[in-house]
Structures are given as structure tokens and as C-alpha cells.
Design a protein with these regions (language model features):
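Solvent-exposed interaction surfaces and binding hotspots enriched for charged
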Residues: 2-153
């Protein structure tokens, strides 16, 4: 049986969820920024409402916090400090769309930095694990003991 549409009712069309839209725009910004910073800035120019800009920021903040969790402790602490500074920039631009756009670009740049740091940390960890495995194999064969004895005299 078809639904009865009453006068003044949209027939099931709903407004987009502002949080979901903010997350989508944040993802778009993160896709654009590494390749074309001008296009990334232009994508934010199309957002005029402070509320919508703040939802994009919420999306970026969620990504940044998630990315930072994968960093070594010292880098994670530095990332937390940078997040505090980004919060100060956001607060200073609370009602200024142009200032909020600058905040969003800086927040997106921070995420790119976090990803770069995470990738570097993963490479270093993999290298350390490889070195440790080689060292353990050498010790098991007695090679390291002979090498250590030769260098300690």
C-alpha cells in the first residue's frame, strides 16, 4: 500500500546530516590537499556558514586524533600540543568564516604530517625488527659472540 503524503510533508526527503556532511567534506579536503592546495582552499570557499565549517573541523579533528594514536609516545605528545594550538586558532576565529577556513587548512596539513610521521615510524620499526632478527640469528650461530670478542680487545 503506498504511503499517503500529507500537505506540507516532503514525502520522505530528509536534510543531510550535518555531521556526516562535515566528515565527507573533511575527507574531500584531505584528498585534495596533497595534490593541489589551491583547489583544497577553493573547496572551503564554497562553505559560507560557520556551522558547516565547524562540522568540517569536527571531521578533521576525529581523523587527527585517530591518526595520532598510532604514533610513538613522543610524537603523540607533540601532536597533542599541535592540536591544542589548532584549538586556539579555531577559538580566535570562532565567528569568522575566513579565519575558520585557515584553521581547517592547518588542521588538514596536520593530518598529512601525522600520516607522514606514522609511515616513517612504521618503516623504522620494520627496520629495527629486521636488525633484531638478524642479530638473533647471528647470536644463535655464534657469529656475534666471535665478532664481539674481536672488537672488545
Amino acid at each position: 500500500m503506498p504511503r499517503l503524503i500529507r500537505p506540507g510533508h516532503s514525502g520522505g526527503v530528509t536534510a543531510p546530516d550535518p555531521a556526516a556532511e562535515g566528515h565527507r567534506r573533511a575527507a574531500d579536503l584531505l584528498t585534495l590537499l596533497p595534490h593541489d592546495s589551491t583547489a583544497a582552499a577553493a573547496s572551503l570557499e564554497g562553505i559560507s556558514e560557520v556551522r558547516d565549517l565547524v562540522f568540517v573541523g569536527a571531521g578533521l579533528t576525529a581523523v587527527a586524533r585517530s591518526e595520532a594514536r598510532g604514533l610513538p609516545p613522543a610524537q603523540r605528545a607533540q601532536a597533542n600540543t599541535r592540536q591544542l594550538r589548532l584549538g586556539e586558532l579555531r577559538d580566535a576565529s570562532r565567528s569568522d568564516p575566513a579565519g575558520l577556513r585557515i584553521w581547517l587548512l592547518r588542521a588538514a596539513e596536520e593530518i598529512l604530517l601525522l600520516r607522514s610521521q606514522r609511515d616513517t615510524a612504521e618503516r623504522v620499526t620494520a627496520s629495527d625488527q629486521e636488525w633484531t632478527a638478524l642479530r638473533a640469528a647471528a647470536e644463535a650461530n655464534g657469529t656475534a659472540a666471535a665478532s664481539d670478542a674481536a672488537t672488545s680487545t
